[in-house]
Design a protein with these regions (language model features):
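N-terminal signal-anchor module of multipass membrane proteins
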Residues: 1-102
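Alpha-helical transmembrane segments in multi-pass membrane proteins
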Residues: 64-72, 76, 88-122, 127, ...
Length: 146
């Protein structure tokens, strides 16, 4: 059985997943609460586990999860890292932990640090893109220290 032909569906499937997360968020709250909720998520000093649904409401939390997931998908795509089963695991982790702790702001320093490391090693970022996304498990520390 040739499973590699199924890999072509991972990219559109993960994009659809992130769009569904954002649509769930948009349907769960009033639109006027969305931007203040996202602002609260981004500016709040996070501990390792901060429940964004409790802090900012389900609308902002699910939109944040969708945004972080789509950013992660684009990082994998732009790095030309192949989409495979591990990509699905990464997107699930990124989406899940975006409901408590990760946000569109605090993931960037870790991803940038990984990119700089790849440049320093003179290796393609695609070799480290998955590691960068998994390393964002420490993203709440960025918010805590900022």
């Amino acid at each position: 059985m040739n499973t590699s032909r199924y890999y072509q569906y991972i990219f559109p499937g993960t994009i659809a997943f992130s769009v569904v997360l954002m649509l769930i968020g948009l349907s769960m709250g009033h639109p006027e609460q969305l931007l203040p909720g996202l602002w609260k998520i981004v500016t709040m000093q996070d501990l390792l586990i901060t429940d964004y649904i409790h802090i900012a409401g389900p609308a902002a939390a699910f939109v944040n999860a969708g945004l972080v997931t789509i950013i992660s998908i684009l990082i994998i795509k732009l790095a030309k890292d192949p989409f495979n089963g591990f990509t699905i695991v990464e997107m699930g982790l990124m989406a899940g932990f975006s409901l408590f702790g990760k946000n569109v702001f605090n993931i960037w320093p870790i991803i940038l640090g990984t990119w700089l490391y790849a440049r320093y090693q003179k290796e393609p970022f695609s070799k480290y893109a998955s590691v960068a996304l998994l390393a964002t498990a420490l993203a709440p520390l960025v918010s805590y220290m900022a």
